[in-house]
Swiss-Prot record:
Homotetramer. Belongs to the argininosuccinate synthase family. Type 1 subfamily. One of its GO terms (molecular function) is argininosuccinate synthase activity. InterPro entries: Arginosuc_syn_C (IPR048268), Arginosuc_syn_N (IPR048267), Arginosuc_synth (IPR001518), Arginosuc_synth_CS (IPR018223), Arginosuc_synth_type_1_subfam (IPR023434), AS_cat/multimer_dom_body (IPR024074), Rossmann-like_a/b/a_fold (IPR014729). This is Argininosuccinate synthase. It comes from Thermoplasma volcanium (strain ATCC 51530 / DSM 4299 / JCM 9571 / NBRC 15438 / GSS1). It catalyses: L-citrulline + L-aspartate + ATP = 2-(N(omega)-L-arginino)succinate + AMP + diphosphate + H(+). Its EC number is 6.3.4.5. Pathway: Amino-acid biosynthesis; L-arginine biosynthesis; L-arginine from L-ornithine and carbamoyl phosphate: step 2/3. L-aspartate binds at residues 115, 119-120. The keyword Metal-binding does not apply. Keywords: Amino-acid biosynthesis, Arginine biosynthesis, ATP-binding, Cytoplasm, Ligase, Nucleotide-binding. One of its GO terms (biological process) is urea cycle. ATP binds at residues 7-15, 113.
């Protein structure tokens, strides 16, 4: 019998697929589940085995996810339409692990549970094909147009446990939690409070708190003078930010497939780190570096969102980000208060910002030199206007 590896989350779609692909497509199905900050690996493995998975592979990849994927997004202030790419960042890692396992154990195909409406089908299949074009890809929910009602009926018929918390479609990892479906799709309604898990609503948040973050080469390394590995620092900031209602995003997102979708995200650590990192950049980098970096940031975010992590162009993008971020060192203090982040002071040895120059009360900057600068700086604008005026006058004469 043919062998297949299924990216398995433990949810309804992928649980049904274990049995369905065996019965209808003739595959022996093995499963792969990764802990990227979201999964109870033991219970998910037991569920896959009970349904009929031949082998169940599980792996804790939180450290790799943090240092090889999230870290690159921190350097690039990764964001798509205001969302910090939490789901999108996890997909290339999942694709990589699936390909490695398929090559090691001889699986002929890899399957995922994505629908034909969403972004993940693109991200999984682009990533896997980029790493190994010979592997066959299967997406039963999409390719055989499986309806949720049909999946539930099939699950009941085959004694597959249907998750009881299925009101919303949720994707969760260290960098954020995304929620969609149910009342969230109704644009006439606010986000139901039962959709939140990581943070409290702003009106229920406490009196606020001040934190200090230390950055080295563009990455956060300490909270309040205590050093952390990146994955633990993120986990701590998710707790701190969550109790202060930091990181709630409710927006309409333009998917790769051209569909608009209302998406709700909880991303406390991502919002805190991105704010702090961006503020330090403004203090340290000059305007030319910031201009170049803004371009790199935008391209990086587009590539990640669109599933192009393994495109050759990502290497120079990331290399440029790493060069610019080698200067991003220092500490920054932030006040977190009822969903808002406020700058509370910063220290560093290489700040381009110079208070003595910016200060109107000192003489360190020679203001007289500005006149000569303006005389030269105006030339491009003034000469082009004069040339066009002259051309119009000659045309009328």
């Amino acid at each position: 019998m043919k062998e297949l590896l299924l990216l398995y989350s433990g949810g309804l779609d992928t649980s049904v697929m274990i049995k369905w692909m065996n019965e209808n497509l003739g595959y022996d199905v093995s499963t792969l589940t990764l802990d990227i900050g979201n999964n109870d690996l033991k219970s998910i493995r037991e569920k896959a085995e009970a349904i009929g998975a031949v082998e169940t592979f599980v792996e804790d990849v939180k450290q790799e996810f943090s240092y090889e994927y999230i870290s690159k997004s921190i350097l690039a202030n990764g964001s798509y339409e205001g969302y910090p790419l939490s789901t999108a960042l996890a997909r290339p890692l999942m694709a990589k692990k699936a390909v490695e396992l398929a090559e090691k154990h001889g699986f002929e195909a890899i399957a995922h549970g994505s629908t034909g409406r969403g972004n993940d089908q693109v991200r999984f299949e682009l990533g896997i094909k980029a790493l190994n074009p010979s592997l066959e890809m299967l997406a039963p929910v999409r390719d055989w147009n499986m309806l949720r009602s049909e999946e539930i009926e099939y699950a009941k018929k085959n004694n597959i446990i249907v998750p009881s918390d299925g009101k919303y479609s949720v994707d969760e990892n260290l960098w954020g939690r995304s929620i969609e479906g149910s009342e969230i799709e109704n644009m006439s309604l606010p986000v139901p409070e039962d959709a939140y898990e990581w943070l409290v609503p702003p009106w229920e948040a406490g009196p606020g708190e001040v934190i200090k973050l230390e950055f080295s080469n563009g990455l956060p390394v300490a909270i309040n003078d205590s050093d952390f590995e990146l994955q633990n620092l993120i986990a701590n900031l998710n707790i701190i930010g969550g109790r202060n209602s930091i990181g709630l995003i409710d927006h309409v997102e333009d998917r790769i497939t051209g569909i608009k979708s209302r998406e709700v995200y909880e991303c406390p650590a991502a919002e805190i780190i991105t704010y702090a990192h961006g503020y330090l950049e403004s203090l340290i980098l000059n305007k030319h570096e910031i201009s170049i970096k803004s371009f790199l940031d935008s391209k990086f975010s587009q590539f990640v969102y669109n599933g192009l992590w393994y495109d050759p162009a990502m290497k120079p993008l990331i290399a440029g980000e790493e060069i610019l971020n080698s200067e991003i060192n220092g500490s920054i203090s932030l006040k977190l208060y009822k969903g808002k982040i406020y700058f509370n002071g910063s220290k560093g040895a290489n700040f381009s910002y110079n208070s003595n120059v910016a200060n109107y009360s000192t003489y360190e900057f020679d203001q007289k030199s500005s006149k000569g600068f303006i005389d030269i700086f105006k030339n491009d604008t003034v000469y082009s206007i004069l040339a066009r005026q002259k051309a119009k006058e000659e045309a009328l004469s």
